[in-house]
């Protein structure tokens, strides 16, 4: 006999609240990042641009992120047209789904009350709502990691390796949303499985090694395909120094994000400066189209090698197509250290949660 599941009316209320907070006002919002919106518009014009996440219609240079979140935004744009709200909509929806997932992650272990409180706090967290009102890819990254967490809890409770492989596969998908930032959960995942899984140490180690192999394969799948293509037949990898996705992942979107440093040097800039620079770069590309060969000039701050765009060899200076240079907190994330969350750059985002710790 099929057991009927009762709908938790409190969860419904929380999800309605989350949807209202995340969706309200996006139709007249000017908070979309023009840099990524320009990329989405380019990606709607050809499969070549779609696959490579090309910033410009000519397919000359990519954005500074892998393509998964932009693929989703592009699909929405193909349905609804390219508008500020249509590229923000998937981010808002992702946040609502994440709230629901948190409820279902917490409930089996800690009960309904804890699940409701957790979901409500996430739904009302100011920075989460603010980020979901932009087309920056963070909300989709959070959704990927929430799915991974849900699968991990399933793996621990059921003792099936398939759930564990699914969890690490989703982290790999997250890598293709925002690269190394997806790996921030890895230490917690590994430790939780080692402590929580009800099996022998040997089986735990073998399972985790297998899961890490799956993670690595999914993570580098798109990067390997792109880097294996002739440089003359694909866009230049924006913000990379060597026209390589893997170098972008471990350089500009990896170590430089962690340390707040830019290897190309230059003065420090705030995160708002980067947004303005992104918009300026999109204008620079549109205004520097080469009518003779149909190619676009690279964004300001990027310098293509001599010999024309077809050569596509050499270094890109100052970070290429994405947010540009700076040292010491170039991403507005404070100075590296154990108290980083309490510095002025991040305290406004993190301090709201201190009472719940």
Task: Locate the predicted segments by residue.
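Membrane-integral, polyisoprenol-dependent glycosyltransferases
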Residues: 1-357
């Amino acid at each position: 006999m099929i057991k009927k599941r009762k709908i938790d009316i409190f969860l419904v209320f929380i999800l309605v609240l989350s949807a209202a907070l995340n969706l309200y006002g996006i139709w007249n919002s000017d908070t979309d990042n023009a840099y990524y919106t320009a990329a989405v518009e380019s990606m709607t014009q050809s499969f070549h641009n779609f696959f490579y996440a090309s910033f410009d219609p000519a397919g000359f240079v990519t954005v500074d992120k892998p393509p998964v979140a932009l693929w989703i935004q592009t699909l929405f744009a193909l349905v609804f047209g390219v508008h500020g709200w249509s590229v923000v909509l998937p981010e808002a929806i992702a946040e609502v789904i994440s709230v629901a997932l948190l409820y279902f992650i917490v409930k089996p272990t800690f009960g309904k009350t804890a699940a409701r409180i957790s979901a409500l706090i996430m739904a009302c967290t100011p920075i989460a709502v603010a980020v979901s009102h932009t087309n920056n890819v963070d909300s989709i990254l959070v959704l990927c990691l929430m799915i991974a967490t849900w699968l991990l809890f399933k793996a621990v409770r059921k003792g099936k390796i398939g759930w564990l492989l699914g969890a690490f596969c989703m982290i790999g998908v997250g890598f293709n949303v925002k690269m190394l930032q997806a790996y921030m959960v890895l230490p917690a995942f590994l430790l939780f499985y080692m402590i929580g899984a009800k099996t022998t140490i040997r089986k735990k180690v073998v399972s985790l090694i297998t899961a890490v192999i799956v993670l690595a394969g999914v993570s580098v799948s798109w990067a390997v395909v792109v880097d294996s293509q002739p440089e003359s037949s694909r866009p230049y990898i924006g913000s990379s120094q060597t026209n390589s996705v893997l170098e972008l992942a471990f350089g500009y979107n990896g170590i430089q994000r962690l340390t707040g440093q830019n290897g190309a040097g230059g003065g420090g800039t705030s995160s708002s400066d980067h947004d303005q620079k992104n918009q300026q770069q999109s204008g620079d590309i549109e205004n520097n189209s080469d009518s003779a060969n149909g190619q676009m000039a690279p964004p300001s701050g990027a310098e293509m090698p001599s010999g024309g765009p077809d050569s596509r060899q050499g270094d890109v200076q100052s970070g290429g197509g994405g947010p540009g240079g700076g040292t010491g907190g170039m991403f507005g994330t404070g100075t590296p250290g154990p108290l980083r969350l309490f510095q002025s750059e991040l305290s406004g985002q993190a301090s709201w949660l201190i009472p719940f710790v």
